[in-house]
Amino acid sequence: MLMSKKNRVMIYEYLFKEGVLVAKKDFHLPKHGEIDVPNLHVIRAMQSLVSRGYVKEQFCWRHYYWYLQNEGIQYLRDFLHLPPEIVPATLKRQTRPEAARPRPKEGAPRAQVGEDRAGYRRGFGGSDKKGEAGAGADTNFQFRGGFGRGRQEQEE
């Protein structure tokens, strides 16, 4: 598709910076959500990169998802004249602050490990479950009929 080089460079710069790109499948949308170019230009430029094997494409619920491959990183680096030190955001490690977790206070009384669960576990002095199972001590059993239509009248 014929598009200006300015639009193509804007699309490639955004893709290289983020590493991923999302576009709604709407060819008549005047502007893309993140880039200031027509949505059709974004879809066609990415379709071109997919056909060359530089980008992996997923489609779900009327949205295209494109992921930059290693060959695509090298191609865009050459196209945009970028140094090798600059990498997409998907390849950068995220730093997690260690102080984000709240630490328990040292002076707070704490239960010993397993004390709160001891009531649920079987102990040595626990009840005998197998001995308690069964019909019980009463051996005077009564067998009665069913209820409703299946029950027969007893004659006296």
From Swiss-Prot:
- The biased composition feature labelled Basic and acidic residues covers 95-119
Which residues does the annotated region (Disordered) include? Answer: 91-156
Query: Which InterPro entries does the UniProt entry name for this protein?
Result: Plectin_eS10_N, Ribosomal_eS10, WH-like_DNA-bd_sf
Spell out where the chain crosses the membrane: none
Can you say where in the cell this protein is located?
Answer: Cytoplasm
Keywords from the named record: Cytoplasm, Ribonucleoprotein, Ribosomal protein
Q: This chain belongs to which protein, by name?
A: Small ribosomal subunit protein eS10
Q: Which organism is it from?
A: Lumbricus rubellus (Humus earthworm)
The organism's lineage is: Eukaryota, Metazoa, Spiralia, Lophotrochozoa, Annelida
